[in-house]
């Protein structure tokens, strides 16, 4: 499987709609939860959809889409933490310090593609994308599935996946919900790159050309072109 990752702009909005379906990924959320909190449940689903569509048309795309050919197979929200107001309301995921980090709070992968490296590809693309936006660090708020009784809501991703991409725990206010961070991001920054980089040829987590398992690590800076 060869994946490409693109920033969500108006050009790719129909692909996102196809991925999210009528449910808007989950319960009509349309990835609005970390922006407006539980209020997303009380609004018409179309309002949540339209808000995300407006963000896709803005100068700051709200996230990344992973494609297998022309089919959108995965999504992650990627934004400056300051744009995700509801993170500040969480007792467990509130700011660790005053650093103007970017955040990777939520993922959605097409059911038939789960466990096939889509999340890995999205994380790999998010790192240079955040760096291009000027982020000093990138944060995530995954579930630590090694903790007994952990939440079964895995939309934030899994801690072990972030760990193999170089993220480290910077706070743990709830056993199964660490705050993880990758920093500094300066070595991934590319002058003039405004949009997330495009990754291609992704074969799934930790696989070489021969298909053998290899040790997964955060890739070095690579040449990327804006989309």
Model-derived features: where do they sit?
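Conserved acyl-donor/pantetheine-binding loop and adjacent beta-alpha core of acyl/acetyltransferases
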Residues: 58, 67, 71-110, 114, ...
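Conserved N-terminal entry element of GNAT/NAT acetyltransferase domains
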Residues: 1-36, 196, 207, 212-215, ...
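Active-site rim helix/loop that mediates acceptor-substrate recognition in acyltransferases
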Residues: 30-63
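Conserved acetyl-CoA-binding loop-helix of GNAT-fold acetyltransferases
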Residues: 106-109, 115-132
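Short, well-ordered beta-strand micro-motif
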Residues: 65-67, 77, 179-183
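Conserved GNAT acetyl-CoA-binding A-motif
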Residues: 123, 130-152
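C-terminal "cap" of GNAT-fold acetyltransferases
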Residues: 153-160, 165, 170-227
């Amino acid at each position: 499987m060869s994946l490409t990752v693109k920033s969500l702009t108006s050009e790719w909005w129909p692909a996102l709609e196809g991925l999210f379906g009528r449910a808007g990924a989950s319960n009509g959320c349309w990835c609005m939860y970390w922006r407006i909190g539980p209020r997303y449940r009380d609004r018409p689903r179309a309002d949540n959809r339209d808000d995300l569509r407006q963000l896709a048309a803005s100068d700051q795309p709200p996230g990344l889409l992973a494609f297998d050919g022309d089919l959108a197979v995965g999504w992650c929200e990627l934004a400056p933490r300051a744009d995700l107001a509801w993170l500040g309301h969480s007792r467990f995921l509130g700011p660790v310090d005053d650093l103007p980090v970017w955040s990777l709070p939520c993922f959605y992968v097409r059911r038939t593609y789960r466990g096939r490296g889509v999340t890995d590809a999205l994380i790999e693309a998010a790192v240079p994308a955040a760096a291009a936006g000027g982020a000093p660090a990138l944060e995530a708020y995954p579930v630590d599935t090694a903790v007994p009784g952990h939440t079964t809501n895995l939309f934030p991703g899994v801690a072990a996946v972030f760990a193999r991409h170089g993220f480290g725990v910077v706070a743990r206010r709830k056993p199964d919900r660490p705050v993880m961070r990758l920093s500094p991001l300066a070595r991934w920054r590319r002058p003039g790159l405004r949009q997330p980089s495009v990754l291609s040829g992704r074969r799934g987590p930790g696989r070489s050309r021969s298909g053998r398992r290899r040790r997964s690590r955060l890739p070095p800076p690579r040449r990327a072109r804006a989309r």
